[in-house]
Amino acid sequence: MGIVDVGSKPILEREATATGAIRLSKEAIDSIINGKSPKGDVREASTISAIQAVKETPRTLPHCHPIPIEACNVEWEVTEEELHCTVTVRTHWTTGVEMEALCGVSAGLLCAWDMLKPVSYTHLTLPTILLV
């Protein structure tokens, strides 16, 4: 068991995008739109959480390589019933950044869920997360 040897692989431009969503109550959606969550601005805090998770992926997942992250973009979309998060990560390296994008989406949505529990704890559905 160990980390895969990527030392002989060429350095290439790598990009990965992951997306996910949590289903929320109308009260939770309204608190996001109006910026009135008891814990603060949901999208702002969750963006920070997503970026931090991207950067810390190898600390959380021991078989992931520490990768120099060149760019990380976090986007949010609010619909009538869901909060969507999309994280895109870019680098020039010997291995991809799929796990970093997935970790970013996961942490961003979990942070949002944590921040919205006081608003509507029983009407939250945990994230659906996809690598796109």
Where are these regions (language model features)?
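Compact, glycine-rich, soluble single-domain proteins
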Residues: 35-73, 97, 101-111, 116
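A short interface-forming secondary-structure element
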Residues: 87-97, 101
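Conserved small/polar residues in nucleotide/adenosyl-binding loops
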Residues: 122-128
